[in-house]
Curated annotation (Swiss-Prot):
Function: NDH-1 shuttles electrons from NADH, via FMN and iron-sulfur (Fe-S) centers, to quinones in the respiratory chain. The immediate electron acceptor for the enzyme in this species is believed to be ubiquinone. Couples the redox reaction to proton translocation (for every two electrons transferred, four hydrogen ions are translocated across the cytoplasmic membrane), and thus conserves the redox energy in a proton gradient.
Name of the protein described by the UniProt record: NADH-quinone oxidoreductase subunit C
Subcellular location: Cell inner membrane
Source organism phylogeny: Bacteria, Pseudomonadati, Pseudomonadota, Betaproteobacteria, Burkholderiales
Keyword rRNA processing: no
Catalytic reaction equation(s): a quinone + NADH + 5 H(+)(in) = a quinol + NAD(+) + 4 H(+)(out)
Membrane topology category: Peripheral membrane protein
GO cellular component term, pick one: plasma membrane
Family: Belongs to the complex I 30 kDa subunit family.
Coiled coil, from the record: none
Length: 202
């Protein structure tokens, strides 16, 4: 693995200085820097991260949605949806994770970064398809993985594991048809391991 060109704590300070009051939180964990910015200033922050001389994050290498509604033991009490981006500076050999929370849980929306990095195009479509996060300014925001007639967003924590409908080919109609799911819900009993005499040990 190639050594990083800048120490994570130094990168944290560089990013904090470049973004100024656009930073809501910045941290280092496992030698990775994560910065949280507000949805209102997300686009502005991303432009700076690409163009600032000490940052030069020329590449967006990943972008995904996250549903925090079941995060942790009791679930998250903050905003439900976030968009997480991973940026790479090829010229400075450094990486950064950027997180932005959607301000409205009922209609999650953030600005599109496709005008800054065109690689965001399909990533944003995927986050829209699977989580229902709308990217304002995206010029072709439509589903990319699920079927055109699909209802709902399957990576949301409240989406049923079995889904709502199943599809099959109907030979009489000579087409694919949708039907309600026929899988019956069942109780799953958690496995209990008793410490006494576990595995035949005495």
């Amino acid at each position: 693995m190639t050594a990083i060109a800048i120490h994570p704590e130094s990168l944290r300070d560089v990013v904090a200085s470049a973004l100024g009051d656009r930073v809501r939180q910045i941290s280092v964990a496992l030698d990775e820097v994560t910065v949280v910015v507000s949805a209102a200033r997300y686009l502005e922050a991303m432009q700076i991260l690409r163009d600032a001389p000490d940052c030069k994050f020329e590449q967006l290498i990943d972008l995904c949605g996250v549903d925090y509604s079941a995060y942790g033991a009791t679930g998250s009490e903050g905003p439900r949806y976030a968009v997480v981006s991973h940026l790479l500076s090829v010229s400075l050999n450094q990486r950064l994770r950027v997180k932005v929370f959607c301000s409205d849980d009922d209609f999650p929306i953030v600005a599109s970064v496709t005008d800054i990095w065109n690689s965001a195009n399909w990533f944003e479509r995927e986050a829209f398809d699977l989580f229902g996060i709308v990217f304002d300014g995206h010029n072709d925001l439509r589903r990319i993985l699920t079927d055109y007639g699909f209802i709902g967003h399957p990576f949301r924590k409240d989406f049923p594991l079995s889904g709502h409908v199943e599809m099959r080919y109907d030979a009489d109609q000579r087409r694919v048809i949708y039907e309600p799911v026929t899988i019956e819900p069942r109780e799953v009993t958690p496995r209990v391991i008793r410490e006494d005499k576990y595995g035949g040990l005495h």
